[in-house]
Swiss-Prot record:
<dbReference type="InterPro" id="IPR030393">
    <property type="entry name" value="G_ENGB_dom"/>
</dbReference>
<comment type="function">
    <text>Necessary for normal cell division and for the maintenance of normal septation.</text>
</comment>
<dbReference type="InterPro" id="IPR027417">
    <property type="entry name" value="P-loop_NTPase"/>
</dbReference>
<keyword id="KW-0131">Cell cycle</keyword>
<keyword id="KW-0132">Cell division</keyword>
<dbReference type="GO" id="GO:0046872">
    <property type="term" value="F:metal ion binding"/>
</dbReference>
<keyword id="KW-0460">Magnesium</keyword>
<comment type="similarity">
    <text>Belongs to the TRAFAC class TrmE-Era-EngA-EngB-Septin-like GTPase superfamily. EngB GTPase family.</text>
</comment>
<dbReference type="InterPro" id="IPR006073">
    <property type="entry name" value="GTP-bd"/>
</dbReference>
<dbReference type="GO" id="GO:0005525">
    <property type="term" value="F:GTP binding"/>
</dbReference>
<feature type="domain" description="EngB-type G">
    <location>
        <begin position="25"/>
        <end position="199"/>
    </location>
</feature>
<keyword id="KW-0717">Septation</keyword>
<feature type="binding site">
    <location>
        <begin position="33"/>
        <end position="40"/>
    </location>
    <ligand>
        <name>GTP</name>
    </ligand>
</feature>
<feature type="binding site">
    <location>
        <position position="62"/>
    </location>
    <ligand>
        <name>Mg(2+)</name>
    </ligand>
</feature>
<feature type="binding site">
    <location>
        <begin position="60"/>
        <end position="64"/>
    </location>
    <ligand>
        <name>GTP</name>
    </ligand>
</feature>
<dbReference type="Pfam" id="PF01926">
    <property type="entry name" value="MMR_HSR1"/>
</dbReference>
<feature type="binding site">
    <location>
        <begin position="78"/>
        <end position="81"/>
    </location>
    <ligand>
        <name>GTP</name>
    </ligand>
</feature>
Amino acid sequence: MIILNYNKTFFLKSISNISDIQIEHGIEIAFIGYSNSGKSSAINALTNQKKLARFSKTPGRTQLINLFQVTSDFRIVDLPGYGYAKAPLLIKIKWQNMIYSYLKNSRSLKGLVLLMDIRYPLKILDQDIISMALNCKIPILLLLTKCDKFTINNQKIQFQKVYEKLDKFLNELHIQLFSSLKKIGIEKLKSKLNFWYEKYR
């Protein structure tokens, strides 16, 4: 298997609309999740760069899409966090339409990393994203983030609950525990991204 050096990942650009990516070559893996799911922390942990993905002081405030270059033909797409309660309804609708259009129409998107706080998994919008991705034949890696908040035993219990709810989708969806703080699951995340890169490039 190809082993990529994620430490060399660099910021490419920010855009306000997914149609502005305007890059036809290579493959993309998108990171998506609620505003407080630990998305930025996961990208920083993956790349071993503390400030690559910037944190917003107000969750959900940033509506920009951030692109990061891993190799010349492999990009990470950091989609805006969703579910921010104070976001205007029109913004929420626009976001949902944009995401569905991206999942359905992007030729470069080959995988989706969906991040969920292990304490509050499978909220309504998480389930919507899973349905959208599966309908569009996009494979999913589901990270149960902040697992360090639980004891090892409770991690296993929560993992099993999520596993059972998604049991019928496990051919297209993989679930794993993750903690940016304790460095849990980072190597498995790299392995999955390497697998997608080798399979689809």
